[in-house]
Amino acid sequence: MSDLDHFDLLPIQMDPQSKAITSQNASRSLAAELEALNTLHRSLLTIEHPSGAPPPPVPVNPKRTANVTKLRDSGNNEYRKGKFPEAIKFYTLGVQMAMQRPMWEPAALVREEISGLLANRAQAHMAMQNWAEGAVDAHASVEARWVGNAKAWWRRGRCLAEMGRLEEARDWVRRGLEVEGEEGE
């Protein structure tokens, strides 16, 4: 039976003080959904806006975007100088800043920023021969953005090959070529 054909009425309660939504007989999936709802509610309460409501749709804080870009550029400069640990620090700070965007900002923007930062951090790990860390970052970059991310597909394949996982590397690069098609680098 599909989810659209079935409906269960579940008893839920709202705490009068915190306005948190709970359920007595919550399954794991319901508990996760309620936690996400309560987290969204708490983040909306922290808005510093005279009306107390979130700003209109799709507002992007230009300062945060500029700071994420500046951190990425600083990481790129350190990478070019051969200072790979410093580059990794800048990329990590950029990832952390991008992940702190409010929930109402476009998710596509966050995914774009994250995928680029993680792909660059993977390259810095590769330069230090930290193959496992590079593979993890490249994989996370691909998960954030599948199409148009040929470098991350290749970087994970290279890391897997360097770790002696040749079959996985070949399969990974093959999948990357299927996704990227003729656009792949």
Each model region followed by its residue ranges:
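Alpha-helical tetratricopeptide repeat
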Residues: M1-E185
